[in-house]
Amino acid sequence: RYYEVPQIEYEDENIKIPPIRNQGWQICDNQTINDFSAIGYYLAYYLRHDIDIPIGLIAVNKGGTSGSCWINETYLQKNQEIKKVYYDEYYQAIMNQTEAQEDLEIAKYKERVKQYQQKVALYQQTYPERNMSQLKKDVGHTPWPGPRGKKDFCRPAGLYYTMFKKICQYSGKAVIWYQGEEDTKNAYLYHQLLQLVIENWREDMKAQIPFIIVQLPEYDDD
């Protein structure tokens, strides 16, 4: 069975995260399997057959995010270098930003993404035989990153509150950690950042839960 935590990026009086029980578990079948995490599915499949115990997967993930999105401010500030690189620099950059300014930047970014998607659709229609690697070389990458701000899902500690905290009270046997690409620009800090994630999650889950660290099978199309 599979449960996917709603990917709510920001919560205020107008945007509320639905209670976790409203979402419900999905049974793995031909209709739902495409929604499953591939890594999680194969792990659950082999465990189910090897130890004959039903497996439930809870997906707490969002693509393009740093490890700093998944821990709270207290842990982000435990390490001075991580605090400087991931926390201080981000919030200093937006400290004078108004909500109207942020909303304007978000609208501009969405328009750039829309135009990019139109280019991709035209390219695929014109060159149906070409793969995604060639498309990226010819058309370019998706506009990234998005604008910084209080509503940015990549903000430090953001998804910790809007996603992880919604499920941390539920007991689990292990965490499959499949993240890190977004932190390559600060790779020298990643070991320390990951250690903080592990400590923070274990504290919130009230258990010395094991973390299974998954590597990317490949990082570059070339």
PLM regions and their residue ranges:
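Cell-envelope and extracellular/periplasmic
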Residues: 1-222
